[in-house]
Structure formats: structure tokens, C-alpha cells
Amino acid sequence: MSADITETPAWQALSDHHAEIGDRHLTELFADDPARGTELALTVGDLYIDYSKHRVTRRTLDLLVDLARAAGLEERRDAMFAGEHINTSEDRAVLHTALRLPRDAKLVVDGQDVVADVHDVLDRMGDFTDRLRSGEWTGATGERITTVVNIGIGGSDLGPVMVYDALRHYADAGISARFVSNVDPADLVAKLDGLEPAKTLFIVASKTFSTLETLTNATAARRWLTDALGDAAVAKHFVAVSTNKKLVDEFGINTDNMFGFWDWVGGRYSVDSAIGLSVMAVIGKERFAEFLAGFHIVDEHFRTAPLHQNAPALLGLIGLWYSNFFGAQSRAVLPYSNDLSRFAAYLQQLTMESNGKSVRADGTPVSTDTGEIFWGEPGTNGQHAFYQLLHQGTRLVPADFIGFSQPTDDLPTADGTGSMHDLLMSNFFAQTQVLAFGKTADAIASEGTPADVVPHKVMPGNRPTTSILATKLTPSVVGQLIALYEHQVFTEGVIWGIDSFDQWGVELGKTQAKALLPVLTGDKSPAAQSDTSTDALVRRYRTERGRPA
């Protein structure tokens, strides 16, 4: 739907409602509705999702659901799951949800049973990783592979590295993984440091097998390998995740060891496709299946739950509530789990590449802000970095707190009497409580604080948070978390009327970089650039590289 949502009665009703309740404090909202602490919460799969500490009333939620219906959210959701071409600018289906359908499901899109195709690739991935993990697959010298190096960028890197970090505790076959993405040579050099060529396998992840950064790194990695083991070693030390057999073969990779995916999978939605091969190599096909099943739990919830009880829809609508009615520009994602240290970076691509759009699907300009800026760090690190702004700054930053009741690792506290995990989680609960309810000047003064210091210690509260609590960080839970955010992104995109599944904004910079490369490297002084800033920068760079300016 691409009509101007801001002109609908549902939008106007929300605007009027915001004028009525926008300044109400969470302390007051809880006093008026004590049951909200348990009733404004949902359990989805293994996730307990508490959204009671948001600046919403039950009436707000009703109006947000009305807005979703006015935008056609349910119809667009059903169209996505059915395989309709909802990516209109590229005329493609959007079927990342098909990547986690069970084997006995059936979904025919454009005359093709995509479930059968998905499980054919999964079976091939499973066979390959079984051989790798058992030691049946060896390198050129007959030695067992102990390190997998994934070479990719964007969705071919951010997803796998995040999931690997989250699930490395499930590694059980003596295989570890490293990830190379940046065309800065320092990245590849650092990741190859200490590795033995004979025990290293490279996964080159590029759908077209022509991505500049990925192929540049892959070529350098091949040189590192062949310098040690000879050209014939490439076939035993490189596999590909791609759909371009010709270029894969020309690179020297046996196309029997090429794992494909489809145009209906966007890069930022692809970690549960063959792009996750590095993860499967480390944790095994059975746990990878648990990972996929976690996605499917949330997919089915999003597909079938009424909007009032639909966690991704509600969280997406609440995010839009802050973006469009409170003027919030960003959302902090704060996992109280060091294993999720890359989760915020992963969500940056998922959310910002999807919804960072300024035109609607029909090409007309949007009439409201779109796209939340996602950022964050694990707790408690962030508490000693940027929480000051969350608590006492002038900007409203809604925050998502993610935590677990059972740790992947635990150690005793300094005095030996307690659990470090309990200490971590006490900070989780304390931060959401203080962000919501704060501490008044009267309460601070009553403690004997000097009058001139009181204003500096006031904690205003009324800072909104979502709390997501699961028992433990398992493969299934990681899948559930990713799907929870995927469908929030979809919800917001539908309301804004944008195409959340293209990314034209990344293309022009790539084209211009190709044009500028010979300008930087040529033997002769280059022609003037079209703007004086770039011209001066290029000439300074050439001078410092020892080339004629």
C-alpha cells in the first residue's frame, strides 16, 4: 500500500492521542494500571517480551493496531508468506521465511516448489559439513581442516559472524571460524595470522561471485594458499556460496562444492540460507536445524497471531510510535550477553538497509520520517559508556534489553559467594527500572544531598524500554530473536508504504568507487574532479602515495 498513511483517520487519531498522553510519566501509567506489568507482556516460543515500560496505554495499542489495519499490514503479511512479488522495485518475491519451512511444507512460487529447493541445498550443506567435521574431508596434504574462513561482506558476513559468536559454545568438532569482510588488507592479514594453510578452508560467499570486496579478498587468500601448497590445492581449500557456476569454476573451485540461494532472499535476510555454511560447519547440521526451527516459531506467530497479541507487529508499531510521534531517531539494542556482542551491528543492516528509504513503493516521496537508527553494545559495557545520555540526556532513545536466566558460562563473584551472571542480570533489571521510574529531586534531597548538587543527580525516568528474557541462548533462541526483528522491520515498512527489500542507495557509491580507482592509481596527474573537495582529497592522497598530484 503506497497511499499517504499520514492522511488517514487512523494516523490523525494517533496524533490527537499523542497530544493527550505524550507527556504522561511511566510512574503515573503504572499507578493507573498496576496490572500492565504482567498484562503488557507476551510469550513467543522461548522469548518473554515485556513491553509494559513503554509510554503507551491500552488505548495507544488499540490505535496503533487500527493504523496497521489502515495500512493493510495483515494483507501485506499474507502476500509475503504466499510468495507474491512484494519487492516491487525489483519485481521479486520476498521469501526468507521459506528458508525455515519444515521439509513437509509446500510452497509453490512462480511454478517452483521452493521448499524442495531449500531442503535440497540444506541436505547438501549437511553432507558437506558432516564430512568436514568428521575429518573425511581433508586438505591437499591430507590433514584435517581446523579453521573455516568466511569471506563475504554485508549480509554474507554480518549474519554469520553474529550467529557464530552467539553459538560458539556449541562448537563440538574442533573447528573454529574466522570472518573477513573489509577490503582493507589489514582485515585479511589479521584473520590469516597464525593459520596453517594445510588446515584452513575458505568459504567465498557472493551470490554473483563478482562483489568487489569479496573477490579481492578471495583472490588474496588464494594467493596465500597457493604460495604454500600450489595451485592444485584450491579445490580442496575453497568452496563457494554463489549462483554463478561459470565464475566459481574460473576461480578454481569445484562447482560440486558450490551452494546456491535465490533472488527471493535478500542478503540481510540470508543467514539461514547457504550463507550460514560457516555456522553449520562449526555447530553441526542438527543444531543448525534447531536454529531454523527457532525462526519458524516466530514466523508462525507473526503469520497467525491477532495483531493485539502479535509481538513483532506490536514492537514494530511501538517503534514507529516513537519515531513518528515523539521524534525519536534511534533505538538502542542492549544484550546482557557478551555472546550477542555483534547483534546490534547485525540489526543495523537488517533495519537501516531495509527501511532507510525516502520514497514510497510507488516512487512518491514519503511524508514522514522513516527508518530507525539501531545501535548498541552489550551490558554492562554500555553502562560505562553511553547510558549517561540514556538516563539524563535530552534525546529520547527507546531501548531493547535482551537477557537470559541461565548463562553459557558462569564464575563466582569476587568474594566467592555469588554468581557473576546474577550480578550481570541485576544490572539488566536495575537499568530498565531506573530508566522507567527515575528518582525525584525530593527523594535525592531527603538523603542529605547538598541543594546545589540535587539537580545534577535527578533521574527523570520516563525512558522507554522493551525487556526480552529467555531461559538460555540456544540455536533456537537466536533464530527466534532474528525473526522477531525481521518482522518488526516489515511492519514498519508497510506502515510507511516503502519497499523494505531493495537497497538502491548502496549502488551509486560502488559505481563511483570503480570510476575513482584509476584516478587514484594512474601514473599521470589526473584531470580535475567535478568538485573541489574531492579533487583536493585525491591529489593529497596521490602525493602521500608517491604519485604525481
From Swiss-Prot:
User: Which SUPFAM superfamilies does this UniProt record tie to the protein?
Assistant: SIS domain
Pathway annotation: Carbohydrate biosynthesis; gluconeogenesis; Carbohydrate degradation; glycolysis; D-glyceraldehyde 3-phosphate and glycerone phosphate from D-glucose: step 2/4
One of the protein's GO biological processes: glucose 6-phosphate metabolic process
> Cytoplasm: present as a keyword of the record?
yes
State its location(s). Answer: Cytoplasm
Please give an example of a GO cellular component term from this record.
cytosol
Keywords noted in UniProt: Cytoplasm, Gluconeogenesis, Glycolysis, Isomerase
Q: Which residues form the active site?
A: E353, H384, K510
Q: What is its main location?
A: cytoplasm
Say yes or no: keyword Isomerase present: yes
Q: Which PROSITE patterns match?
A: P_GLUCOSE_ISOMERASE_1, P_GLUCOSE_ISOMERASE_2, P_GLUCOSE_ISOMERASE_3
Family statement drawn from the similarity comment of this UniProt entry: Belongs to the GPI family.
Name the record gives this protein: Glucose-6-phosphate isomerase
Q: Which gene encodes it?
A: pgi
